[in-house]
Amino acid sequence: MGFINGLLGNASTISTAEAKAELARILLEGENVNAAFKLVRDIIVFTDKRLILVDKQGLTGKKTEIQSIPYKSISRFSVETAGRFDLDSELKIWISGAELPAVSKQFKKDESIYDIQKALAAFCM
């Protein structure tokens, strides 16, 4: 069901071991993965030091953008839930000193956006 959810744009939880293996080349020594979510090919990872956003691009997904955001740099975030006619939810994250959100992720109508919001709140506050 996780594969189907991913295709539909729903975020699904992935194991911390899987996320750690995926990010082995960029994790610091002693840095622990606390939670991870997969959205189609993208990954949102919460470590004990930072938020890591992996954006796999292109047809094959070989080109990858990795954003590393220290929690202390996150000034605010917002969650816009899906409505009756608007089927997408949206997560926005602002970085200190920025007027526009540095991160904007779209989710299909599902409950996983609340889990991601809860993890953000736990690490940023």
Q: Where do the protein language model's features map onto the residues?
A:
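Acidic, Ser/Thr- and proline-rich intrinsically disordered linker/docking segments
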Residues: 2-27, 36, 59-125
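Conserved beta-hairpin
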Residues: 37-60
